[in-house]
């Protein structure tokens, strides 16, 4: 092995640009340096959002985003990610390889600069990528800084090059190895346990993100493999699309491969596969580009017979959770066009009001994916697109293509209009119902539901409300609460399955009315999160199947009609114990799972304790606990276990609720069979 501190700077080929392709040389001179890495280890949250599970997975996606940039530029079509047996992660792509030539301003190989200097990457300065999805250069250097060690291997300029790092610092110079005709980059890293609260990766979290990436990058193959011992026990019981890979003489490993030739058209088909009947059989596919402004848009859309809207937008493959100008252009074009068409074809008479945007989008599943040279992100989480040119471009393209599609498919267009009119009728009926109930005070927080045991504090940030199924459990909860800041709302039985009902019917449900008035925010178009009366909404149901069903019904309602509560982190699931282990009169412990029960019993026996066969009590429901037991195990802030409901991926959550609460029985059975062993918290 020859150790070269001054790698040969061969002249790379220059690719000229279609959309997303390289517009200049991708060599050492294309790597621009903006600032150092000093602060990353001191304040990691500023760069990756958190040092919890979400931040840990962000490391993986930052490295993968760099490989996706190569795919966007047309130079890579395969990305292979492996969770190693020792907890490391390896990301391999078949792109051109990070350049190894010397960066003039630094006097170091480009690969070392990219890995050790913040904001050093090929997307800055205009000489590298015309479209970039990740923080290219920022991400991989931050990953390096927050890892105990990193190994990089680059195949470029006819050789294989390697370099190793420890805590962000090179441990040796970039080494030139054997000759090779292949190209690509391999980054292997081990996250620092002194920085992160956990270094345990979730196969499901990564596979969901990679499936989304594969949908958004037509023709890209993304493979995820898990070589950890814990993965071998669940091979064959994984997420949809998971394969098990087995080499003769070796145990199978858990792996999944995603490849979608149809891109976002396949994404819409996937999301609509659980949505019941379709209003039109083919997905509407829009694809347009403005090369001069380095702007392109892909849209896939299809209406189904359900009542919820599922419009998801992306900019440079980044999920724009907060929407933005591309969504605004899409909505404006569609609302204007459908109303004009409905009047021209006499579906709407002169005296009729226009259809609202929400009427037209009822049952619509759509993916909007724009790619821009200089995306401007705004909003609280920097996931709202701000480019004004995106709105005008998308609005123009959608209007042109949708007008043409309606003219060529008059029967399907008529069905879409009829569904929109039905939605408008229901919306007006719901408005009248809201006005009526508002006059009666049923939806106003000023007239709280009679069964609500409210708390004394008026500070929402300190207040929490427990939604409890059944009056008996509600009675125990009321007695066991801290009345200063804990409120109790008992609900009777299972609330309405909102997945199968329109808003007018939903607002007639007594339990739904109680929830809306207790929370104080209003619902749907009247929703105002500033009026929320409790910053913790805690769903407290039995630990059995019925209890989980009730929680799922409640979560479906919150997701469909009060989604900002979930997005803002206000919704929690309580975790009541399953067992009480009695060692003696005043010596007992609680267990929250079968495994914990067995472990506590075994530990007790090792410590010389004895237990009778009838000394392990299984709680069948919250009503079996007295007020003191409920307080200690499930309500006391010092002892309880809560699971915060998070929303990392709205499209995946939409699909999950469609599976759990929709009409497709077989899809629901399949999901439960695959995931039954892993369900502890519903983390969506």
From Swiss-Prot:
The residues listed in the UniProt record as binding Mg(2+) 2, with positions renumbered to this chain, are 542, 544
UniProt subunit comment: Heterotetramer, composed of two GyrA and two GyrB chains. In the heterotetramer, GyrA contains the active site tyrosine that forms a transient covalent intermediate with DNA, while GyrB binds cofactors and catalyzes ATP hydrolysis.
Q: What is this protein for, i.e. what is its function?
A: A type II topoisomerase that negatively supercoils closed circular double-stranded (ds) DNA in an ATP-dependent manner to modulate DNA topology and maintain chromosomes in an underwound state. Negative supercoiling favors strand separation, and DNA replication, transcription, recombination and repair, all of which involve strand separation. Also able to catalyze the interconversion of other topological isomers of dsDNA rings, including catenanes and knotted rings. Type II topoisomerases break and join 2 DNA strands simultaneously in an ATP-dependent manner.
Q: Does the keyword Isomerase apply?
A: yes
> PROSITE patterns given for it?
TOPOISOMERASE_II, TOPRIM
Which CDD domains is this protein grouped with? HATPase_GyrB-like, TopoII_Trans_DNA_gyrase, TOPRIM_TopoIIA_GyrB
- State the encoding gene: gyrBS
Q: What is this protein called?
A: DNA gyrase subunit B, novobiocin-sensitive
Show the segment(s) annotated as Novobiocin-binding: 154-302
Give me the ranges of the annotated region Disordered: 1-22
Family under the similarity heading: Belongs to the type II topoisomerase GyrB family.
Could you say which cofactors this protein requires?
Mg(2+); Mn(2+); Ca(2+)
Q: Which reaction does it catalyse?
A: ATP-dependent breakage, passage and rejoining of double-stranded DNA
- Tell me the domain of life: Bacteria
| Major enzyme class | isomerase
Native organism: Streptomyces niveus (Streptomyces spheroides)
The record places domain Toprim at 463-577
């Amino acid at each position: 092995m020859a150790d070269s501190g001054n790698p040969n700077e061969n002249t790379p080929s220059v690719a000229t640009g279609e959309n997303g392709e390289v517009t200049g040389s991708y060599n050492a001179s294309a790597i621009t340096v903006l600032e150092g890495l000093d602060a990353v280890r001191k304040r990691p949250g500023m760069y990756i959002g958190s040092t919890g599970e979400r931040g840990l997975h962000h490391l993986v996606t930052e490295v993968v985003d760099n490989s996706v940039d190569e795919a966007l530029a047309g130079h890579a079509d395969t990305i292979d990610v492996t969770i190693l047996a020792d907890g490391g992660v390896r990301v391999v792509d078949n792109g051109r390889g990070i350049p190894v030539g010397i960066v003039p301003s630094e006097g170091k190989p480009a690969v070392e600069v990219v890995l050790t200097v913040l904001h050093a990457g090929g997307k800055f300065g205009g000489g590298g990528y015309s479209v970039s999805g990740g923080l290219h250069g920022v991400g991989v250097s931050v990953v390096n800084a927050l890892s105990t060690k990193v190994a990089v291997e680059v195949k470029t300029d006819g050789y294989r090059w390697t370099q190793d790092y420890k805590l962000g610092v090179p441990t040796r110079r970039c080494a030139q190895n054997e000759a090779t005709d292949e190209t690509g980059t391999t980054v292997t890293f081990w996250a620092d346990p002194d920085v992160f609260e956990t270094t345990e990766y979730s196969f499901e979290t990564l596979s969901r993100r990679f499936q989304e990436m594969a949908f958004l990058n037509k023709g890209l193959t993304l493979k995820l493999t898990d070589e950890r011992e814990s993965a071998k026990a669940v091979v064959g019981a994984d997420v949809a699309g998971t394969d098990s890979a087995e080499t003769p003489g070796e145990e199978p490993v858990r792996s999944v491969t995603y490849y979608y030739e149809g891109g976002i058209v396949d994404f819409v088909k996937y999301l609509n596969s659980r949505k019941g009947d379709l209003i039109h059989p083919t997905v509407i596919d829009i694809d347009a580009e403005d090369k001069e402004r380095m702007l392109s848009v892909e849209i896939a859309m299809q209406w189904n017979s359900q009542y919820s809207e599922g419009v998801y937008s992306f900019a440079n493959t980044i999920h724009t959770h907060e929407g933005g100008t591309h969504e605004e252009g899409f909505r404006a074009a569609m609302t204007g066009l459908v109303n004009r068409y409905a009047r021209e074809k006499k579906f709407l008479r002169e005296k009729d009001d226009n259809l609202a945007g929400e009427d037209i989008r009822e049952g619509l599943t759509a993916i909007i994916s724009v790619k821009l040279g200089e995306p401007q992100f705004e909003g609280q989480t920097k996931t709202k697109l701000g480019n004004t040119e995106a709105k005008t471009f998308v609005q123009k393209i959608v209007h042109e293509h949708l007008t043409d599609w309606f003219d060529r498919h008059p029967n399907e267009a008529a069905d879409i209009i009829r569904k929109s009119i039905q939605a408008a009728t229901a919306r007006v009926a719901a408005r009248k119902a809201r006005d009526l109930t508002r006059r009666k005070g049923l939806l106003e927080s000023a007239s709280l539901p009679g069964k609500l045991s409210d708390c004394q504090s008026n500070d929402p940030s300190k207040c929490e409300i427990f939604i409890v199924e059944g009056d008996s459990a509600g009675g125990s909860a009321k007695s066991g609460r801290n009345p200063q800041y804990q409120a109790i709302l008992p609900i009777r039985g299972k609330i309405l399955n909102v997945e199968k009902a329109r808003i007018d019917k939903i607002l007639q449900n007594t339990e739904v009315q109680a929830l809306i008035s207790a929370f104080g925010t209003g619902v749907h178009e009247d929703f105002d999160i500033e009026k929320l009366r409790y910053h913790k909404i805690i769903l407290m149901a039995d630990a059995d199947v019925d209890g989980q069903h009730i929680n799922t019904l409640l979560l479906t309602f919150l997701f469909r009609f009060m989604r900002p509560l979930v997005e803002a982190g206000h919704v929690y699931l309580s975790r009541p114990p399953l067992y009480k282990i009695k060692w003696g009169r005043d010596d007992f412990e609680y267990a929250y799972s079968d495994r914990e029960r067995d472990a506590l019993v075994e530990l007790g026996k090792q410590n010389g304790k004895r237990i009778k066969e009838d000394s392990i009590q299984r709680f069948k429901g919250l009503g079996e606990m007295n007020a003191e037991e409920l307080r200690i195990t499930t309500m006391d802030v010092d002892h309880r276990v809560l699971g915060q409901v998070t929303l990392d991926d709205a499209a995946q959550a939409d699909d999950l609720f469609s599976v759990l609460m929709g009409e497709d029985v077989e899809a629901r059975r399949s999901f439960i069979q695959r995931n039954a062993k892993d369900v502890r918290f519903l983390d969506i």
